Amino acid sequence: QQARKQTAKISKSQRAPKLKKLQAIVLCPTRELAIQVADEIRNLSRYMHGIKVLPIYGGQDIVKQIRSLKSGTQIVIGTPGRVMDHMRRKTMKLDFVHTVVLDEADEMLNMGFREDIEFVLSGVPEERQTVLFSATMPKPIMEITKKFQNNAKVIKVTKKELTVPNIEQYYYDVKPKKKEEVLSRLLDIYSPRLSVVFCNTKKQVDLLVNALLGRGYFAAGLHGDMKQEQRDRVMQGFRTGKTEILVATDVAARGIDVDEVEAVF
């Protein structure tokens, strides 16, 4: 569902599927989300002959990315830093770009991507559609909309319920020193097939993973300091069930889409 909303906004590329030039750019805060969005676009465009989609992000072989861009990629989904890198290298031609999507714009700003975003938006043709998705609309977001959007339409989506009815939720007031023990007991009591544990920092992720492994659990960590190969290996293990507990920072976990997750801590 997260990825489908972007796809609807870049449907303009349908009007020129035979044009082997870059026509749409989607900026995402994380590699995982970029990959997820790219996969969904591929699924929805598989019956449209000639549409070529490419996710680009740091930690991936840039030579392969350049080769793919030269081969006629029409839709790029990438992290701001890597897209900006290609623009500076002049390996990404922007003359035919007519759509730019900023996904999770507030999160990208929280991660320090404001200058990168403005660099990208300043480099694409002025005659374009710029679409911005954001859970919140703080002042920095409004400044970007005023600077790079003309007569923008604001669409607010609200829900009467913030939670899904069939998900049970519990709150435990636990002292910091007791969190590891309580988590272990909850894992033993409920025995979820797959579970995700969120931590605030990368250090906390590493410490908790080591503690869980020491207790005999099949756990693995995911955070921004890991190389892409490591992240891919961790996610593959989690999807196949080899890893039962994924410990991650909130940013690193964005874009994770695994149906069998039964518990989130």
Language model features with spans:
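Conserved helicase RecA-like core
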Residues: 1-265
